[in-house]
Amino acid sequence: MIRNFKRTAAIVGVVAASSASLVACGDSNDASTNDTTAAATNADTATNDAAAGDSNLTGTTGQLVAEGATSQQNAMDYFGARYAEAVPGANLAYNATGSGAGVKNFIGDQAAFAGSDSPLKDDEVQPAADRCGGNEAWHLPMVIGPVAIAYNLDGVEDLNLTVDNLVDIFKGDITSWNDPAIAEANPGAELPDENISVIYRSDESGTSDNFQKFLSAASDGRWESSGKAFPQAVGAGANGSTGVAEQVKAIPGAITYVEAGFADQAANIDFGNGPVELNEETVGNALDGLEFETEGHNMVVDAAKLFAMDGADTYPLILTTYEIVCSAGYDDQTRDMVKDFLTVALDSQDEELASEGFIPVSGAHADRLREAVNAIS
């Protein structure tokens, strides 16, 4: 089960305690609906000086178009509403089409920034720089959210799964809930003789990419697949975070990987030192050890080190969603709107964001993010 997490603000304190090593990001809604976050409809392009107020906003109005990860849709909804309040006449249109599509359309100059659960691939770095007028594209992890192993198993409220169990389930080597390997992880539990229905993301997804990185790192390479496209040999696909979550709710015996805010019931995971419940404390313990591959304003999380954590009471299956932005090269209006929106997002790392299952950033990492936003030119 997910206790004291999905609807709690207590995690804010955990992040404050671990802020010396944290950066945030998140993801969002179902791509099939192509929903957008539109918190205001006035697309006037004048500058609203009064909106700048005490928040150091430019007050530039218009529609800011962004696209990408479905995992952060709920966060974008919230940030977009706050943005419209802070800058009357401005609105965010966030298309939750998945990380892959977001990066593609950012590079294609169809979106001002991309939401992605994975950093740019090596062969995307130069095209992104070209899109930015020859300037570097930065990764700004603005939203962090744990990934849950969501399941639908009647009568089993507390389910323990080892990393090996997960690898074997998603490879199709374990096909029944009363398999001896699962029973061994759940002593005394009455597991039903019921088929396991694997549900995976059918769209190109940063969540899939990170989940596969986790499976590989945590199992010493037993999981061999990688990338944003999840293997389709086992189970059935669904589009977006909402899609996989709804499929699990509808299908008895189903299992999937999805952001915690979308999961009603989540398994405890044994990362190597006993089952670990997904809650604010265990996630905070993992965030204490978060490291970065890069310095300066381009903030790429070292996912390999994160996913290899196996400490007791530590839940390292955490999704960091990047807002991929141009460090420079925007036209003046777009630059100012991007900076205003990201500033509002940083000002909105609060209890309401936590209530949606995300982890608000604070302390040193929030400061580092704010410095990066201010440096966009």
Language-model-detected regions and their locations in the chain:
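Extracytoplasmic ligand-binding site segments that recognize negatively charged/polar headgroups
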Residues: 146-150, 156-245
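C-terminal lobe and pocket-closing loops
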Residues: 274-336
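Ligand-binding pocket segment of bilobal, Venus flytrap-like solute-binding proteins
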Residues: 103, 204-293
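Extracellular/periplasmic catalytic domains that process cell-envelope and extracellular macromolecules
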Residues: 58-59, 106-108, 132-134, 140-143, ...
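Bacterial N-terminal signal peptides that target proteins for export
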Residues: 2-12
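Extracellular/periplasmic juxtamembrane helices and adjacent flexible linkers that interface
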Residues: 2, 27, 50, 54-58, ...
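N-terminal segment of the mature folded domain
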Residues: 27, 34, 38, 48-183, ...
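C-terminal motif of bacterial Sec signal peptides marking the signal peptidase cleavage site
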Residues: 20-24
